[in-house]
Amino acid sequence: RLVRGILDQYNRRLQEFAEAISMEMGAPIDFALSDQAPCLPWHTQNFLKAFDHIEWIRPLDPTQPRDKPQPAVALEPIGVVGLITPWNWPVNQIALKAIPAMLAGCTCVLKPSEESPLNAMLFAEFCHDAGIPPGVFNLVNGDGPGVGAQLSTHPDVEMISFTGSTRAGRAISKAAVDTLKRVTLELGGKG
């Protein structure tokens, strides 16, 4: 229900959101409205549909009758998830990382690119105005070597999801080793 509230906030502030995208990305406002801003509701609606079909506790052996006690697999939140997003198509990356993490019951710390923080600031406002409890979605701004490195090494962060350069992805992977974090990387770009 709270994540649906983010969609309500998006719908109320669509023009403002598209203008922020246009300013950050240098995209024409029509393109921001038609192609970039719709990423948030599209991904969110799809995650909400998928969420309804997740079997959070399921039998280890689904062929066994369910009327008898048996071992089960329980899906549980990982905990605190660090989300590091790139400068390009930032709203797409925020939606792909933050929405499923919150639906799974995780708390998030989002560090957007220092070159495109406006989308993340608006998303944080959407979360606040939608009634997401304090501490569930957190926003930190700053550069990769400073803030990104802190997220990657912090002992309370259980997982890092990073999209960006191969060089930075390597650094994040190495930094996360000491705390045995789960790491997901989408790499490309400039080295």
Describe the role of every protein-language-model region:
Residues 1-6, 62:
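Short secondary-structure junction/hinge motifs that connect adjacent elements
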Residues 4-15, 29-55, 67-69:
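Long amphipathic alpha-helix in the N-terminal Rossmann-like dinucleotide-binding domain
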Residues 5, 9, 20, 41-48, ...:
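Alpha-helical structural signal in soluble globular domains
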Residues 12, 16, 27, 39, ...:
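Short alpha-helical
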Residues 20-30, 34, 59-66:
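Short linear capping/connector segments at secondary-structure termini
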Residues 58-135, 158:
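Conserved small-residue-rich beta-alpha loop and adjacent elements
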Residues 80, 129-191:
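Conserved NAD(P)+-binding/catalytic subdomain of aldehyde/semialdehyde dehydrogenases
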